[in-house]
A protein has these predicted regions:
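Active-site loop immediately N-terminal to the catalytic Tyr-X3-Lys motif
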Residues: 143-147
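Conserved glycine-rich cofactor-binding loop
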Residues: 16-17
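SDR active-site lid
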Residues: 169-234
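Conserved NAD(P)H cofactor-binding loop of Rossmann-fold oxidoreductase domains
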Residues: 83-88
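Active-site helix of classical SDR
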Residues: 115, 152
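Residue(s) in the substrate-gating loop at a strand-loop-helix junction
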Residues: 136
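Substrate-binding pocket helix/loop in short-chain dehydrogenase/reductase
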Residues: 91-92, 96-104
Length: 273
């Protein structure tokens, strides 16, 4: 039996822009009641709909996440969409521990906190509740200069795998969504820190862009069809399969085919290695 999204009450993080905004646009068509959480006050203010409640919260700060939990205490949501993401690109030697922790707070710990709260405030126990977690291709294969992001997403992926089985006892479906490289500001405007930014070196993600609106519609269809995994077939998936079977080949492909090759050559020229 298909899942009926009509009139569902939903909380989504990172909903003011990008994939989150595209998902909200699709969910509004189904008369969903939405709580949109985002750290960008300007973009939040641009969202105006009677079915959307807006909450300003920076999930990089766990104190703010705690305040968020107090604001939604007692609410009975049908669906939680853990969509917010944050990335810092840098050589490990240049990234601060605080920035590394910020990555983990936004991409992992805040979502764990929301998931834990969601379990205790179920609107029902008859299979009508779902948690949708946005992981990443990089959760399956990390990329140089993106260690904080990739490792936090890998943690989130493993957490989701665990929850998918564990939450069955509460009749909660836990869905793993693996977005491709989307045509959003998250990817288009992302920059390196430190030396790599100063030298304006190409970002270490050479995958082609994919339509955000199209993927949002695919997610909605996947939810309605009770899918456990939602992803798009691409050459990246072929690479991940090869990497799974032969990790050493994955290493070679990353070194030779990604923008890391350009970065590595520049580091050598400037005597950084």
């Amino acid at each position: 039996m298909n899942y009926n999204l009509q009139n569902k009450k939903i909380l989504i993080t990172g909903g003011a822009d990008g994939l989150g905004k595209s998902l909200i646009d699709e969910l509004i068509k189904k008369n969903c009641i939405i709580t949109c959480v985002d750290k960008d006050e300007i973009k939040l203010n641009n969202i105006n709909h009677e079915n959307i409640k807006k909450i300003l919260c920076d999930l990089r700060n766990l104190n703010e996440t705690e305040l968020l939990l107090k604001k939604i205490e007692g609410e009975k949501y049908d669906i939680l969409i853990n969509n917010a993401g944050y990335e810092i690109g840098s050589l490990l030697g240049e990234v601060s521990i605080k920035d590394f922790i910020d990555n983990y707070n936004c991409n992992f710990f805040s979502h764990v906190m929301l998931t834990k709260a969601f379990i205790s405030t179920l609107s029902s126990r008859n299979g009508n509740t779902k948690i949708i977690n946005m992981v990443s291709d990089t959760a399956f294969r990390a990329i140089p200069t993106r260690s904080s992001y990739c490792s936090s997403k890998a943690s989130f992926r493993n957490f989701t795998e665990s929850m998918r089985v564990e939450l069955k006892i509460y009749n909660i479906d836990c869905i793993t969504v693996t977005p491709p490289k989307l045509d959003t500001d998250f990817f288009k405007k992302i920059q390196y820190f430190g030396y790599l930014n100063k030298e304006k070196l190409p970002y270490a993600d050479s995958r082609p862009f994919y339509s955000t609106n199209k993927f949002a519609r695919q997610i909605i269809t996947g939810i309605e069809n009770n899918k456990k995994y939602i992803w798009v077939f691409s050459i990246t998936k072929i690479f991940l399969f090869i990497n799974y079977l032969f990790p050493f080949i994955g290493d070679l492909m990353v070194e030779k085919l990604s923008t890391w090759k350009t970065i590595k050559e520049k580091l050598k020229i400037d005597n950084k290695v």
